[in-house]
């Protein structure tokens, strides 16, 4: 009987640990989202050779470093986080990731780009995706792997949404 009890209690412990990992990752994402946007911009500026583009990136960086600009950016990030679970349930994970990627336009420091990276880093690791998660979902994943990735994304977004609502300013509706 005690062996059965150990096996039964081991499962919730493992689930609790996974939930704690998700919560920690989501907390780190929400707490560091603006800093990650700033780091992306700094990196892009360092590698940019075209003067006009570099000037535009520097202007965006200066804006993010202001209190008002940072607050506005966090509000937009939080707004996207709050909407994303319904996007996934309505359109699917692949289409939602494509939406984030399109809205991010590969622009460093864009809230959609930062959230895309948060989701793809976490979900990609959990489902052992090779390379870019979106590409893996479209080209390689089985339907079972796609469902697992979707469930993992929704579970992470549950935590991201909670922490965004608690920690980030309300963004204006898009």
Where are these regions (language model features)?
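Small/polar/charged residue-enriched interaction surfaces, especially the RNA/DNA-contacting tracks
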Residues: 1-174
């Amino acid at each position: 009987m005690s062996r059965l009890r150990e096996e039964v209690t081991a499962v919730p412990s493992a689930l609790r640990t996974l939930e704690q990992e998700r919560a920690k990752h989501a907390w780190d994402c929400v707490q560091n989202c603006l800093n990650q946007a700033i780091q992306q911009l700094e990196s892009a500026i360092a590698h940019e050779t075209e003067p006009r583009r570099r000037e535009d990136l520097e202007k965006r960086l200066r804006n993010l470093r202001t209190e008002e600009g940072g607050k506005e950016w966090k509000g937009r990030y939080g707004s996207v986080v709050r909407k994303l679970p319904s996007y996934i349930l309505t359109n699917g994970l692949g289409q939602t990731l494509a939406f984030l990627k399109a809205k991010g336009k590969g622009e460093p420091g864009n809230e959609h780009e930062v959230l895309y990276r948060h989701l793809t880093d976490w979900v990609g690791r959990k489902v052992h995706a090779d390379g870019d998660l979106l590409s893996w979902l479209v080209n390689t994943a089985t339907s079972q792997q796609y469902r697992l990735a979707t469930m993992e994304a929704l579970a992470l977004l549950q935590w991201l949404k909670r922490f965004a609502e608690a920690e980030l300013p309300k963004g204006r509706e898009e």
